[in-house]
């Protein structure tokens, strides 16, 4: 059986109804969830959490009023609200909520991040999340699974983001709709494992999980992925599937670098960027977005905040930052950013004429020093 089949206790293609162990949403999706919930339900029957991470603190009166509405709804229904502590997917991990769960539904497309912990986690739209809140359960068609088996070890300049840009690019002509990605023989750290499952959504995967031993049964596709020969990658505008070796875009001038997000804002990511920036000065706007308060505190304890500030970087409060183009570093017309986020669609981080290149924290940090896309090969 695949990992998905084991958790859902059903074969791929079957339609099942399952209890949901945890449902969560954030300030960006919760208003529509509340609207749908109030049309049908009077009480919450699910274990639920709300996180303020997308546009926090509120930058406008409109956003402030929406957040006020969320607080009032949560108070009425006894739902904990976590404000200003970081990105929802990171906090669910840090708070131990994922460890106590088998099936998780989130009001965000990157909920499958939790699959790094062996959880069947899926993002759903507002109506489906509202139903989970009201019933404590959901229906699912058990997805088929694609197995990714890693071979070899990554080089010192290769990070999980490089792996995923290459994998997503290789799958762009393969129909991943409503299929799961399952990773085996994974040589990455806990922080980097979360990058693998988080980025899987950009391959159009329904969810993603990390397993231990690959048994080869019931998988519709098997991908052997050699790590030792993989170098730094960059995804060109305007798709994460536009991946190329960094050398092919080296020298591209950039206006801004963003290192953070639910993809690459964990401690290891920022520490490795700081190792590059130590004693140097950035050549372009460089924004650092810790994924959580705990990440930020550790940055303070280990002197990383001083390194980044001395290098000329701007450190944001924990949260999503400019990833979704709402505040704290949005792009102007025709500006170019090198970002460690997971999406580079037109207009994603601000102006629709801006260009977004995606890369690992290492590539982003080195590029910040030179003001152009640069391979980290000689700097690490």
Curated annotation (Swiss-Prot):
One Pfam family it belongs to: Aconitase
Cystine residue pairs: none
Keyword set, alphabetical order: 4Fe-4S, Amino-acid biosynthesis, Branched-chain amino acid biosynthesis, Iron, Iron-sulfur, Leucine biosynthesis, Lyase, Metal-binding
Protein name from the UniProt record: 3-isopropylmalate dehydratase large subunit
Domain of life: Archaea
Transcription listed as a keyword: no
Family according to the record: Belongs to the aconitase/IPM isomerase family. LeuC type 2 subfamily.
Originating species: Pyrococcus horikoshii (strain ATCC 700860 / DSM 12428 / JCM 9974 / NBRC 100139 / OT-3)
Alphabetical list of NCBIfam families matching this protein: IPMI_arch, PRK00402.1
Free-text function comment from the UniProt entry: Catalyzes the isomerization between 2-isopropylmalate and 3-isopropylmalate, via the formation of 2-isopropylmaleate.
PANTHER family cross-referenced by the UniProt entry: HOMOACONITASE, MITOCHONDRIAL, HOMOACONITASE, MITOCHONDRIAL-RELATED
